[in-house]
Regions:
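Structural recognition of alpha->loop->beta junctions
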Residues: 97-102, 136-140, 162, 246-257
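Fungal secretory targeting signals
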Residues: 1-28
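C-terminal domain-boundary segment and adjacent tail
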Residues: 34-41, 69, 73, 81-83, ...
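Short low-complexity, flexible loop/linker segments enriched in glycine and/or proline
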Residues: 89-92, 120-122, 181-185, 244-248
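A short acidic, amphipathic alpha-helical/loop segment
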Residues: 61-65, 93, 154-158, 214-218
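Alpha-helical scaffold elements lining the catalytic groove of polysaccharide deacetylases
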Residues: 99, 110-139, 150-197, 211-214
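Active-site beta->alpha N-cap acidic-glycine motif
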Residues: 27-135, 139-141, 237
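Active-site-proximal beta-strand/loop segments in catalytic clefts of secreted hydrolases
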Residues: 50-54, 76-80, 108-110, 145-150, ...
Length: 257
């Protein structure tokens, strides 16, 4: 009887252990390694032109300028900032960026300051836009950029749980803080004059002046200086841009903000 009782305890303990291994919990997600933070490119003579806050009207113009120059960019999309990502026109914009070979990534759902949110709230901001991008294009992004560039350990932990890296920058054209096209151009000129090995540039595709004046100017100046304009993933040494690549979904009633 004692042997049977001991055997029962062993079986129960083993079953409990296997159950715990088979069913990951939120706590297990929280204890994954924190996300890596990248603020500089690593591949020499590359520039990553990145664009936040879209999808919006001027994405097409930026994409056209890049493609015409044999260049690629990276677009960090929101879910519900300048319009809902599920709006038909925004769906087209996201698809266009991806289909043209640009990298697409997460800028969170509603452009909130993540450092003021709880673990669950940050997680919600991240997964909702990831879900939208996967539905629209079939890909799950491997990179995210926190709104305002604000992050803390909590944000790094949630991003790590989502298997994402955090992308920052080492150059800002200051279009989001009111810089005129002339001022943004001078900032690019000053950066190029220093002859850095690489540049990871922050721009915003929601500003007409950026799309029509600054970016065409920057592309020309950067290429004349010998830089290759590539995606973020490429400038980081050809890291995977996406966690997975699949087929897009068809729109249904769940596609709303």
């Amino acid at each position: 009887m004692q042997f049977i009782a001991k055997l029962s305890l062993i079986v129960a303990a083993t079953s409990s252990l296997l159950g715990a291994l088979a069913l990951p919990t939120d706590h297990m997600l929280e204890t994954r390694a924190a996300a890596k933070v990248y603020s500089k490119c690593t591949k020499p003579k590359t520039v990553a032109l990145t664009f936040d806050d879209g999808p919006w009207y001027y994405l097409y113009d930026i994409s056209k300028a890049l493609v015409a120059a044999g260049a690629k960019g990276t677009f960090f999309f929101n879910g519900d900032n300048y319009g809902c990502i599920y709006d038909p026109e925004n769906v087209k914009r996201v698809k266009h960026a991806y289909d043209k070979g640009h990298q697409i990534a997460s800028h969170t759902w509603a452009h909130k300051d993540l450092t003021k949110l709880s673990w669950d709230q940050v997680h919600d901001e991240m997964w909702r836009v990831e879900q939208a991008l996967q539905r629209i294009t079939g890909v799950v992004p491997a990179f995210m950029r926190p709104p305002f560039g604000n992050y803390n350990d909590n944000v790094k932990n949630v991003a790590g749980a989502r298997n994402q890296s955090i992308a920052m920058w080492d150059f800002d054209d200051e279009d989001s803080t009111g810089a005129t096209p002339a001022q943004s151009k001078k900032l690019y000129d000053a950066a190029i004059k220093k002859k850095p090995s690489t540049i990871l540039a922050l721009n915003h595709d929601v500003h007409e002046r950026t799309a029509h004046e600054v970016i065409p100017y920057a592309i020309e100046k950067l290429q004349k200086a010998g830089y290759k304009l590539v995606t973020l993933a490429e400038c980081l040494g050809d890291k995977p841009a996406y966690q997975s690549v699949g087929k897009p979904s068809k729109p249904d009633s769940s596609w709303h903000c």
